[in-house]
From Swiss-Prot:
Annotated gene: Klhdc10
Species: Rattus norvegicus
InterPro entries registered for this protein in UniProt: Gal_Oxase/kelch_b-propeller, Kelch-typ_b-propeller, Kelch_1, KLHDC10
Keyword annotations from UniProtKB, A to Z: Cytoplasm, Kelch repeat, Methylation, Nucleus, Repeat, Ubl conjugation pathway
Subcellular location, principal: nucleus
UniProt-recorded name of the protein: Kelch domain-containing protein 10
Quaternary organization: Component of a CRL2 E3 ubiquitin-protein ligase complex, also named ECS (Elongin BC-CUL2/5-SOCS-box protein) complex, composed of CUL2, Elongin BC (ELOB and ELOC), RBX1 and substrate-specific adapter KLHDC10. Interacts (via the 6 Kelch repeats) with PPP5C.
Positions with biased composition (Gly residues): 15-36
Length: 410
C-alpha cells in the first residue's frame, strides 16, 4: 500500500479511488489464437511498441475505458510508482491526465492530443460513449477525496476537443467511485463517495434539457441499497441493476441485487439464481462490467481478501448466474473494461499485487459471443496483411473492402 493510500484509509471513511487494500493476488501468462477458439479465451495484446511515437500507456489503476468498432479509448488513471508513471515527464504524477486510444486493426496505442480543458479528476470517474462523444462525470484527484468533481465533461473523439456541459438543477455531490449509465437520452448516476461518506443517491441528467434531477424513490430508507462505491450498473431500459461494490471495509454480495424501476420510481430487491455446481459469484468491489443485450458480464475485482480473476454472466431475464470457462491471466481490480459492438471485451490495467502495490499495463481481449463471419474474416485479413492500414482508400476499395471496413482502418 502506498503512503497516499494508507493516509486515505486511516483519515476517513471513504475508499481509495485507484487501489490499495490487503490480500494476495495471482498472475499468469496468456496465449493467442484466432477463430472460434477465441470464445471465452483471454488473449494478451502486446501492441506494436517498436513503432516510433507509439509507446503503450504506463501501468495504471482507477482509469476508465469505452470502445466502438474501431478503438478502445482509455482515460485517466493513477500510479504511485514515480518511475512507472513517467517520472519528471508526468506533471500530474501520480495521476495520468491523458486520453489514449488503442486501434484494433493495427494494434497501435496512440496518446491523443486534444484541445479544450481536460478534467483533472482522473481516478474513479465515470465514462460512457455517446456517439462520437466521451461523457466523463465525477472522479477525484490527489489526495483522494480532497478534489472531487461533479461536472460533466465531453470529449468529441472525432474533433479531439473537450468541452464542459452547462447543466442546471440538483446535481450530485462531488463524488468518485459512482456508477453511471446512459438510458433513453439521460445519464443516471448512482452511489459513490465524497471521501468522507458513501452514498445511495440517484441522479438523472436529461441530455436534451441539461437539467439534473435527484430522484426520490418511493421506498422506506430500510429498503434502499446499502451505501457504496466502485460498484457497477446494468440496465434493460426499465430497470437499473446495481452489481456489487462496497466500502473500504466491505464488499456486497451478488446473491441478491437491487434494481431501480424507472416506471414505478422504486427500488426492488431481486434474488439471483446460483450456478448449478459453483454457486454464486464472490462478493466484490472494484470489478468491471460490460453488457451485451440482456447478458451482463462481471470480471475481476476484490472481495476484501483476494484479487479475483473470474468472469461471470448474469442474464437480466432469468437472473441466472453462469461462470464462464475462462480465468484472467492477471487477476486484477481497479481495472477497466469495455465491449465492442461485435461482442469482444477488452480489459486494461489495474492492481495485480496488493502487498507490492503493483499495477499492470497489460491489455487483454476475450470474445464473449461467437464472432460473426465478418469479424472472423476481418481478423484473418488483418493477420495476413498487417500493413493494410497503410493503403489508400482507393486501393482498399479496389481490393473489395466496404466503406465500413475502411473506416475501421483509419
Amino acid at each position: 500500500m502506498s503512503a497516499a493510500q494508507g493516509w486515505d484509509r486511516n483519515r476517513r471513511r471513504g475508499g481509495g479511488a485507484a487501489g490499495g487494500a490487503s490480500g494476495v493476488s495471482g498472475a499468469g501468462a496468456a496465449g493467442g489464437g484466432r477463430g472460434t477458439g477465441q470464445l471465452n479465451r483471454f488473449v494478451q495484446l502486446s501492441g506494436r511498441p517498436h513503432l516510433p511515437g507509439h509507446r503503450p500507456p504506463p501501468a495504471r489503476s482507477g482509469h476508465r475505458c469505452v470502445a466502438d468498432n474501431t478503438n478502445l479509448y482509455v482515460f485517466g488513471g493513477y500510479n504511485p510508482d514515480y518511475d512507472e508513471s513517467g517520472g519528471p515527464d508526468n506533471e500530474d504524477y501520480p495521476l495520468f491526465r491523458e486520453l489514449w486510444r488503442y486501434h484494433f486493426a493495427t494494434g497501435v496505442w496512440h496518446q491523443m492530443g486534444t484541445d479544450g480543458y481536460m478534467p483533472r479528476e482522473l481516478a474513479s470517474m465515470s465514462l460512457v460513449l455517446h456517439g462520437n462523444n466521451l461523457l466523463v462525470f465525477g472522479g477525484t484527484g490527489i489526495p483522494f477525496g480532497e478534489s472531487n468533481g461533479n461536472d460533466v465533461h465531453v470529449c468529441n473523439v472525432k474533433y479531439k476537443r473537450w468541452a464542459l456541459l452547462s447543466c442546471r438543477g440538483k446535481r450530485p455531490s462531488r463524488i468518485y467511485g459512482q456508477a453511471m449509465a446512459l438510458i433513453n437520452g439521460s445519464l443516471y448516476v448512482f452511489g459513490g463517495t465524497t471521501g468522507y461518506i458513501y452514498s445511495t443517491d440517484l441522479h438523472k441528467l436529461d441530455l436534451n434539457t441539461m437539467v439534473w434531477t435527484q430522484l426520490k424513490p418511493n421506498n422506506l430508507s430500510c429498503d434502499l441499497p446499502e451505501e457504496r462505491y466502485r460498484h457497477e450498473i446494468a440496465h434493460d431500459g426499465q430497470r437499473i441493476y446495481i452489481l456489487g461494490g462496497g466500502t473500504s471495509w466491505t464488499a456486497y454480495s451478488l446473491n441478491k441485487i437491487h434494481a431501480y424501476n424507472l416506471e414505478t420510481n422504486a427500488w426492488e430487491e431481486i434474488a439471483t439464481k446460483p450456478h448449478e455446481k459453483i454457486g454464486f459469484p464472490a462478493a466484490r468491489r472494484c470489478h468491471s462490467c460490460v453488457q451485451i443485450k440482456n447478458d451482463v458480464f462481471i470480471c475481476g475485482g476484490y472481495n476484501g481478501e483476494v484479487i479475483l480473476g473470474d468472469i461471470w454472466k448474469l442474464n437480466l431475464q432469468t437472473f441466472q448466474w453462469v461462470k464462464l470457462p475462462a480465468t484472467m491471466p492477471e487477476p486484477v481490480y481497479f481495472h477497466c473494461a469495455a465491449v465492442t459492438p461485435a461482442g469482444c471485451m477488452y480489459i486494461h490495467g489495474g492492481v495485480v499485487n496488493i502487498h507490492e502495490n503493483k499495477r499492470t499495463g497489460s491489455l487483454f481481449k476475450i470474445w464473449l459471443v461467437v464472432p460473426s463471419l465478418l469479424e472472423l474474416a476481418w481478423e484473418k485479413l488483418l493477420a495476413a496483411f498487417p500493413n493494410l492500414a497503410n493503403l489508400s482508400r482507393t486501393q482498399l476499395l479496389h481490393l473489395g473492402l466496404t466503406q465500413e471496413l475502411i473506416e475501421r482502418l483509419k
